[in-house]
Amino acid sequence: MNQTIFNFSAGPAVLPHVVLEQVQAELLDWHGSGMSVMEMSHRGPEFMKIAAEAEQDLRDLLDIPANYKILFLQGGATLQFAMVPLNLMRGHGKASYVQTGIWSKKAIAEARRFTAVEIAASNEDRHASYVPMQADWQVSPDTAYVHITGNETIGGVEFDFIPDLGDIPLVSDASSHILSKPTDVSRFGLIYAGAQKNIGPAGLTLVIVRDDLLGHAPANTATMLDYAVYAKEESMHNTPPTFAIYVAGLVFKWLKQLGGLERMAEINARKARLLYDAIDESRGFYANPVETRNRSRMNVPFTLADAAMDEAFLKGARSHGLIQLKGHRSVGGMRASIYNAMPEAGVQILADYLRDFARQHG
């Protein structure tokens, strides 16, 4: 294919081209070992080196304190919706959740299988278009933890602050914005993220958890759902997703070579500005429903003034090499996911196309 394709999928999502090239070059023979990474024993010295480097590079990128464990798990963020309450209740009678969209609702529904859930705040009063300020939250002092969804992938709503909860552990689903900017990990009790948006291929789930929150799962908790098991055995209780860890490790190295998360944050801010400016300047031809301070830098949903033009818009986008722009099935419209690996050039082409299409059809 001669045309450059820019993939705006929400996940699995675009990976850095240089990472894909390295994967291709090493696919049949990793570093002269005579093996593909896919063929390696997860306990062999070759893969142990890959895993150790991936963990250290991630620790460096996020400046993760020594009293936090990094776990490489499976099951996606959806499994974390259950693992979090299973492991973090610690004898408390309830957990608190901030409801900001579809994914936080899913986390709430799953948590209710295991404990009482207190809705500390909700944005449904304004059609899930903002993040409630912490001053408006109602959090019981005896709650086990407070859970937030840092970025709602479908609604395009992103937190613009880290809540200060004192001694109450803060838990964040960071699946779609992890590594997009510097983050003070010490402000959180636990962070989890499915890999397939900003980390690497599907199949890997990342958990960063503070040491004091380990070891509290009920005695009858299934072994594979206990964080302490993975922490004790360095994510090797059973065979981990080896190839996904390998690719994630390459992405971590790419981020470090780029200049780290401060540099990545600058690039992401520019990319998001390109799209939101094109939407806002369209005089209503396009609309994004999210309040400005909470507009996601990673997922930009928008609608056309006339939904009858959606198919023409998507067809035209495809002719420009812009794919996977159709919105989530639950909300319709369009969505451009512009994760770390999406080149700025691709976002510029999309912004130009938005303006051209509006001129032709407005």
Curated annotation (Swiss-Prot):
<dbReference type="InterPro" id="IPR000192">
    <property type="entry name" value="Aminotrans_V_dom"/>
</dbReference>
<feature type="binding site">
    <location>
        <position position="103"/>
    </location>
    <ligand>
        <name>pyridoxal 5'-phosphate</name>
    </ligand>
</feature>
<keyword id="KW-0718">Serine biosynthesis</keyword>
<protein>
    <recommendedName>
        <fullName>Phosphoserine aminotransferase</fullName>
        <ecNumber>2.6.1.52</ecNumber>
    </recommendedName>
</protein>
<feature type="binding site">
    <location>
        <position position="153"/>
    </location>
    <ligand>
        <name>pyridoxal 5'-phosphate</name>
    </ligand>
</feature>
<feature type="binding site">
    <location>
        <position position="196"/>
    </location>
    <ligand>
        <name>pyridoxal 5'-phosphate</name>
    </ligand>
</feature>
<comment type="pathway">
    <text>Cofactor biosynthesis; pyridoxine 5'-phosphate biosynthesis; pyridoxine 5'-phosphate from D-erythrose 4-phosphate: step 3/5.</text>
</comment>
<dbReference type="InterPro" id="IPR022278">
    <property type="entry name" value="Pser_aminoTfrase"/>
</dbReference>
<dbReference type="InterPro" id="IPR015421">
    <property type="entry name" value="PyrdxlP-dep_Trfase_major"/>
</dbReference>
<comment type="function">
    <text>Catalyzes the reversible conversion of 3-phosphohydroxypyruvate to phosphoserine and of 3-hydroxy-2-oxo-4-phosphonooxybutanoate to phosphohydroxythreonine.</text>
</comment>
<dbReference type="InterPro" id="IPR015422">
    <property type="entry name" value="PyrdxlP-dep_Trfase_small"/>
</dbReference>
<feature type="binding site">
    <location>
        <position position="43"/>
    </location>
    <ligand>
        <name>L-glutamate</name>
    </ligand>
</feature>
<dbReference type="GO" id="GO:0006564">
    <property type="term" value="P:L-serine biosynthetic process"/>
</dbReference>
<comment type="subunit">
    <text>Homodimer.</text>
</comment>
<dbReference type="GO" id="GO:0005737">
    <property type="term" value="C:cytoplasm"/>
</dbReference>
<keyword id="KW-0663">Pyridoxal phosphate</keyword>
<dbReference type="InterPro" id="IPR015424">
    <property type="entry name" value="PyrdxlP-dep_Trfase"/>
</dbReference>
<keyword id="KW-0028">Amino-acid biosynthesis</keyword>
<dbReference type="GO" id="GO:0004648">
    <property type="term" value="F:O-phospho-L-serine:2-oxoglutarate aminotransferase activity"/>
</dbReference>
<comment type="similarity">
    <text>Belongs to the class-V pyridoxal-phosphate-dependent aminotransferase family. SerC subfamily.</text>
</comment>
<keyword id="KW-0808">Transferase</keyword>
<dbReference type="InterPro" id="IPR020578">
    <property type="entry name" value="Aminotrans_V_PyrdxlP_BS"/>
</dbReference>
<feature type="modified residue" description="N6-(pyridoxal phosphate)lysine">
    <location>
        <position position="197"/>
    </location>
</feature>
<comment type="pathway">
    <text>Amino-acid biosynthesis; L-serine biosynthesis; L-serine from 3-phospho-D-glycerate: step 2/3.</text>
</comment>
<feature type="binding site">
    <location>
        <position position="173"/>
    </location>
    <ligand>
        <name>pyridoxal 5'-phosphate</name>
    </ligand>
</feature>
<feature type="binding site">
    <location>
        <begin position="77"/>
        <end position="78"/>
    </location>
    <ligand>
        <name>pyridoxal 5'-phosphate</name>
    </ligand>
</feature>
<feature type="binding site">
    <location>
        <begin position="238"/>
        <end position="239"/>
    </location>
    <ligand>
        <name>pyridoxal 5'-phosphate</name>
    </ligand>
</feature>
<keyword id="KW-0032">Aminotransferase</keyword>
<dbReference type="GO" id="GO:0008615">
    <property type="term" value="P:pyridoxine biosynthetic process"/>
</dbReference>
<dbReference type="GO" id="GO:0030170">
    <property type="term" value="F:pyridoxal phosphate binding"/>
</dbReference>
<keyword id="KW-0664">Pyridoxine biosynthesis</keyword>
<keyword id="KW-0963">Cytoplasm</keyword>
<dbReference type="Pfam" id="PF00266">
    <property type="entry name" value="Aminotran_5"/>
</dbReference>
